[in-house]
Amino acid sequence: MEGKRYSNSFTSSEMVKEEGRAAYYKLLDSVRDGDTVRIKRGVYATAEQLADTMIDVEAIVPGGVLCLFSAWNVHGLTTSLPQAYHIAVKRGRKVTLPVFPKIELHHITNTMFDIGVEEQIISSYRIHIYNKERCVCDAVKYRNKVGMDVCAEVVNSYLALPGRNLSLLFDYADK
C-alpha cells in the first residue's frame, strides 16, 4: 500500500482518493492481491500494521486487562493473530464498547480478576495484561472454548521458554 500512513496505522479510501485516481486503483489492486486487508468499508491496513497495532485499553475499557488470545499473542505463546481484542473486566460491570476496533469482553469473578495482572508498555501504551503463567492457566481452563490445539500450543510454547516459573504456574493452577 503506497498511500500515507494515517491515524492508527489505517488508510482511508477517501484519503487515498485525494492522492489521485491511480493511487486509489493501486489500493484496490493491493487488496485484490492480498497485500492489504479491508477492515471495513473505506478503511484498509496491511497485515504488518494490524499485527503492530495496539489500542489504549485503559481509555476504551477503564480497568480492563488484556487476556486470552490477545495476551497469548503479546507474550508470543501462540502464532495466531486474534480477531478481536480480548479484555477482561470484573463480573457484573457494564461497559459501552466502540464499533471499531472489535473488542470481546470476558467477565471474570472479583476473586480471580487481579491474579497475575502486570503492566507493560506496548506500542507506547501502558497496558494491563495477565502474565504468562496466568495466560497458561486460562488456556487450560477454557480449553473447550478455545480449542485443544490452541491450548496445547500455549502450554508447549510456555514450557519451551527459558524463563518460565513453574512454581508460580502451579500456584495459579490451585486457585
Model region roles, listed by residue range:
Residues 1-70, 92, 97:
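Short beta-edge/loop segments at beta->alpha junctions of small alpha/beta modules
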Residues 72-75:
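Short secondary-structure capping/turn segments at boundaries of alpha-helices and beta-strands
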Residues 77-175:
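Phosphate-handling catalytic interfaces
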